[in-house]
Regions:
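Active-site phosphate-binding and catalytic loops of NTP-dependent enzymes
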Residues: 91, 114-123, 259, 395-402, ...
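Conserved phosphate-binding elements of NTP-dependent enzyme cores
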Residues: 5, 13-17, 24, 545, ...
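Short secondary-structure subsegments characteristic of cysteine-rich extracellular domains
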Residues: 369-393, 503-511, 581-583, 589, ...
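Charged catalytic and DNA/RNA-contacting regions of genome-maintenance
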Residues: 1-339, 348, 352-355, 359-368, ...
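Charged, surface-exposed helical/loop "interaction arms" that form contiguous linear patches used
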Residues: 369, 373, 383-386, 405, ...
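ATPase nucleotide-binding head domains, primarily ABC-like/P-loop NTPase cores
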Residues: 39-40, 238, 308-309, 316-319, ...
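Extended, charged coiled-coil "arm/hinge" scaffolds of SMC/Rad50-like chromosome-maintenance ATPases
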Residues: 508, 512-546
Length: 872
């Protein structure tokens, strides 16, 4: 829309001056009680939010398109826009319209983006909202920084250069950012860009190289974290991870308008400290959401999430997404869980106390960003009052090193509780502007002003009685309205008694209203007392809030420690409820599970009893368990169960088993299930091959690999060949040699047990009664050479006629194959098996095709069809 800006009204010129500074944002322009949008913003957002599009005079011939939202409902609209990827610049009135002559001063105080949200009602309680900064230089490293503005978490990491793109994708999968900042060179990471576009589907914000530079950000970052040099943060002076931190802090400073005191410490993560889980493993194991419905219920997080606090819920999700690989740290968590399990009374008391603990992290964020309400401060005080009781209970289990350390990190926060209790009333209003927030006795001047306010009615009543006596007007009344203030009202029958010092202000049908100098003076005293009291109360509230902000470091450390205690207690609670056992952590390469169960499937079964299974894997004779059996028999559930038990052990949780010895693995890979990746334009088979390729590239001898039905997305011969080659490669100790669970319906692979060291055949037990089967869900040694496909089809509900016809065809095929194997000398024209028929089709196709008349592309198509026929 072309606009002659010089002809615009002063207010519209002010609007455009701000809009030009933030061209990629929707500008919420504060006008009184509304945020207004104009011109293109108004047209676009009125459609998005289904708002009425109106107009406003702007100095031009045509009215400016306009739509608006009430300022008190802004969060609801922000949420909808941010979810759709919009960035919003919040423009506030900086001067009071009532006292400002001319144009009200306005400026943008904050930019709201998907990655910079701090409002609790716009965020998921149990999940972090990460902003990511990604910096890459062609031919160099890739640095990453993740920050959650709502909690103050900020993490920097440098993915390993080897397999760089895969490592970057793993990190993005772990933190699932809502928004990613990146420099131009980052676009060269093609696989990463594809992952962001197809899988994460988050907002990407391109930033100039200067935003990641030391020249612009070094001093600012050092000042922010209060360090003389970057080495104190374990950051190199130069490096991609440092550039990523620069880019992060630059963007936060820009969007929050320098309000970034929330970040006081930075964590530099070592990727090697955590179990490697790529996107497919996280998805297939259903760690935080189900594979099909993308729902929380049915995931491992849903099962484990009995944490009492919001901080604990977020910490639990982080632990599930970042299992440990250092045995000492794993065992420290397990020991802490064990003592809670043994001392169940202490566990019950701790969890009861945690029920009254509020979200310290996000409360302090609102304190720091000056948006905390009086009720937020009371929530801080309520939490602070719970801490002595919590520490007293933790003293009873402090013989465990981890719990002793966490206990030492929890501060009493007496100052927080005392200050808030002295300053804020018991049940404060939502906003300090409503008054009645500061407790009586906290400040002498405020008490004095309130005395005048509260005595105002008595003063007016006395004056009313005095004027009646002085004038003899028995019906004289003193009233108040917002236009005239206080007034004296006299009815017509007493007009002759009105004294000369009464000044007429308003004539009504049956009465006149007057004022006097004494009445105006009294009015000024009363009204100014109210205004002064509100201003003083707001000032005192700001002082209290700022005093609490100074306690940030103490509160932050306390919040982190309480969150960890909450997760450990939740682990103990889940272990008791579900009869889990403490796993033995080992480093000898053995994974041994007796009576193992799938944690989620077991919980979801309402009436059925889950059938437990044993597992034994090592790095020698039992590297690969080759599992055969019909579909629906439970192969996939069993393999996922082994992976989940391993993962649960490495997050420090008890596991669903009678006994478990878990040797720490460095990575878990899964190739499970089949679903066409239509958004990527790839078939089931192509997706499967990509996933298998990644496993073969990145698995190590210390990895755990889960492979389900490799090769089923193509022809039988191709599928068998690929499956066998993959199994041989993984099991070969000179190639990978890692622990693997390999489920297949290709019975031809059973002989691998006799040809490759480390392969052991297992199968799902099936009980057959005539033409029906029953799955026993039990893993037993030995392979089977019957897939029971027709029986499974019958169970699935295929019509009986179709099932019978399938049996007839199966017998015919088996007879033909047997005849072919018995009579290899038989002439071609006597063989009526499928292979011969397909060969004949290929010959006839070639005879009928004149290659001279075909283009190169058409020749290739014919060749492909012939090849497919010959392959079967």
């Amino acid at each position: 829309m072309e606009i002659q800006k010089e002809k615009l009204s002063p207010m519209m010129q002010q609007y455009f001056a701000l809009k030009e500074k933030y061209p990629d944002c929707v500008l919420f322009f504060r006008l009184g009680d509304f945020y207004e949008m104009f011109f293109d913003d108004a047209i676009r957002i009125s459609r998005e939010l289904e708002l009425t599009l109106t107009g406003r005079d702007c100095g031009l011939k045509e009215r400016a398109p306009m739509c608006g939202i009430p300022y008190h409902s802004v969060d609801m609209y922000l949420k909808r826009l941010v979810e759709r990827g919009y960035k919003i610049a919040i423009c506030e009135q900086l001067t009071d319209p009532a006292t400002t002559k001319g144009l009200v001063e306005r400026d943008v105080i904050r930019i709201v983006t998907p990655g910079t949200l701090i409002e609790s009602n716009l965020l998921e309680e149990g999940a972090n909202n990460y902003l990511c900064s990604l910096y890459f230089e062609e031919g160099g490293d890739c640095g990453l920084c993740f920050a959650d503005l709502s909690t103050g978490d900020i993490i920097a990491l440098l993915p390993e250069q080897k397999n760089l793109e895969a490592n970057v994708i793993d990190a993005l999968s772990r933190y699932t950012p809502a928004e990613i900042l990146m420099n131009e060179d980052a676009l060269l990471l093609k696989n990463v860009m594809e992952f962001i576009k197809i899988r994460l589907q988050c907002v990407v914000t391109m930033r100039d190289a200067e935003c990641f530079s030391a020249e612009r950000n070094h001093d600012f970052v050092c000042h922010q974290f209060q360090v003389p040099e970057l080495s104190y943060l374990q950051l190199p002076e130069t490096g991609s991870e440092t550039a990523a931190v620069y880019g992060m802090m630059d963007y936060i400073k820009e969007t929050q308008k320098n309000q970034i005191a929330r970040f006081i410490s930075l964590t530099v993560n070592d990727d090697d400290a955590y179990l490697g889980l790529d996107f497919n493993a996280r998805r297939n194991l259903e760690l935080t959401e189900t594979l099909r419905g993308k729902e929380r219920k049915g995931s491992l997080l849903w099962l484990m999430n009995t944490a009492k606090t919001s901080m604990g819920k977020r910490m639990l999700k982080t632990w599930i997404e970042q299992p440990l690989v250092q045995p000492a740290k794993i065992m420290a968590r397990l020991d802490a869980v064990e003592i809670f399990v043994k001392k169940s009374v202490v566990l019950m008391e701790v969890r009861s106390i945690l029920d009254s603990v509020y979200d310290l992290e996000r409360l302090m964020t609102r304190v720091l960003y000056k948006t905390a309400t009086p009720r937020d401060l009371k929530a801080l005080a309520t939490t602070a009052r719970q801490i002595p009781a919590l520490k007293a209970e933790l003293e009873k289990v402090a013989d465990r090193k981890l719990l002793a350390r966490l206990l030492s990190q929890i501060s009493n926060l007496d100052m927080v509780a005392d200050l808030v209790d002295r300053a804020i009333v018991e049940n404060p209003p939502v906003s300090v502007k409503d008054g009645g927030v500061i407790r009586e006795g906290f400040h002498q001047d405020l008490d004095y002003l309130r005395g005048i306010m509260n005595g105002g009615n008595q003063i007016i009543e006395k004056m009313e009685q005095s004027e009646r006596e002085r004038t003899g007007i028995k019906g004289l009344k003193i009233g108040f309205n917002r236009v005239f203030g206080y007034y004296i009202e006299v009815t017509r029958s007493y007009y002759d008694l009105v004294p000369d010092d009464y000044v007429r202000k308003q004539t009504l049908t049956n009465c006149e209203r007057f004022i006097t100098p004494d009445l105006k003076k009294t009015e000024n005293d009363i009204l100014s007392a109210k205004e002064k009291a509100l201003r003083l109360e707001e000032s005192l509230y700001v002082e209290v809030r700022d005093c609490l902000a100074a306690q940030l470091k103490q509160v932050q450390e306390t919040a982190s420690a309480i969150a960890q205690v909450d997760v450990l207690a939740a682990f103990a609670n889940v272990a008791i409820e579900n009869q889990y056992t403490k796993p033995e952590i080992a480093m000898d390469g053995v994974i041994q599970i007796r009576g193992g169960r799938h944690p989620v499937v077991e919980r979801m079964l309402s009436d059925d009893i889950f059938v437990p299974n044993d597992t034994y894997l090592d790095n020698k004779a039992n590297r690969m368990l080759l599992i055969t059996g019909p579909n629906m028999a439970g192969k996939s559930t069993y393999m996922r169960q082994v992976a989940l038990i391993t993962l649960m052990a490495q997050i420090g949780s008890f596991v669903p088993a009678d006994y478990a010895k878990i040797s720490v693995v460095d990575k878990i890979f899964t190739r499970v299930g089949a679903s066409d990746d239509l958004t990527a334009g790839q078939s089931t088979f192509m997706v499967e091959m990509h996933e298998v390729s990644d496993i073969l590239k990145y698995a190590t001898p210390n990895s755990l690999v889960i492979l389900d039905e490799v090769g089923r997305g193509t022809s039988t011969f191709d599928g068998v060949s690929i499956a066998r080659a993959v199994a041989e490669y993984i099991c070969n100790s000179r190639q990978i040699g890692c622990k693997t669970l390999f489920a297949t319906h290709y019975h031809e692979l059973i002989d691998l047990e006799h040809t490759i060291e480390g392969v052991k055949n297992y199968s799902i037990a099936v009980k057959k009664h005539g033409d029906t089967i029953r799955f026993l869900r039990k893993i037993v040694p030995g392979g089977i050479d019957d897939s029971y496909g027709i029986e499974v089809a019958k169970l699935a509900g295929l019509p009986e006629k179709v099932v019978k016809r399938a049996r007839v065809l199966l017998r015919q095929m088996e007879q033909q194959i047997a005849a072919q194997n018995q009579k290899p000398e038989q002439s071609d024209d006597m063989q009526y098996n499928f292979a011969a028929m397909q060969q004949e089709q290929a010959v006839q196709m070639l005879k009928k095709t004149n290659l001279q008349e075909l283009s190169d592309a058409e020749c290739r198509q014919v060749l492909e069809e012939v090849t497919n026929l010959l392959r079967g």
